[in-house]
């Protein structure tokens, strides 16, 4: 498999993900346009997010923080979170179990 051959899917306005699913996890490389909003939500999946480039304001359980390159955020199952990209961003997300709705 070559990441360059995976066509990105627009999951939300401004969120373009190259998505790979394993048996028990999902891996997503996001390209996010400046000003794109991630509405507050929660899901059963555990999530680990790594910011490769750009800057976003991310809120987890009501606590907002500015995240830039090198930031890692661990999001436990069923925890409310949201965000907005302050610049164009590239982010790597890993989810377990699989994000079935992204298939």
Model features per residue range: what roles?
Residues 23, 59-63, 86:
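Short strand-coil-strand connectors
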Residues 31-33, 43-58:
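Short, conserved beta-strand element in jelly-roll/cupin
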Residues 37-38, 57, 73, 77-82:
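Histidine-centered metal-chelating micro-motifs
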Residues 39, 48, 63-65:
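Short, surface-exposed secondary-structure edge patches
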Residues 52-53, 68-69, 87:
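A cytosolic small-molecule/anion-sensing beta-strand core signal
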Residues 77-101:
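Ligand-binding loop in jelly-roll beta-barrel domains
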């Amino acid at each position: 498999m070559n990441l360059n051959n995976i066509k990105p899917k627009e999951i939300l306005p401004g969120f373009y993900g190259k998505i790979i699913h394993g048996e028990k996890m999902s891996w997503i490389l996001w390209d996010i346009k400046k000003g794109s909003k991630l509405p507050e939500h929660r899901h059963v999946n555990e999530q680990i997010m790594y910011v490769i480039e750009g800057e976003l304001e991310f809120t987890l359980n009501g606590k907002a923080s500015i995240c830039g390159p090198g930031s890692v955020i661990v999001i436990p199952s069923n925890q409310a979170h949201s965000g907005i990209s302050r610049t164009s961003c590239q982010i790597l997300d890993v989810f377990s179990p699989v994000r079935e709705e992204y298939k």
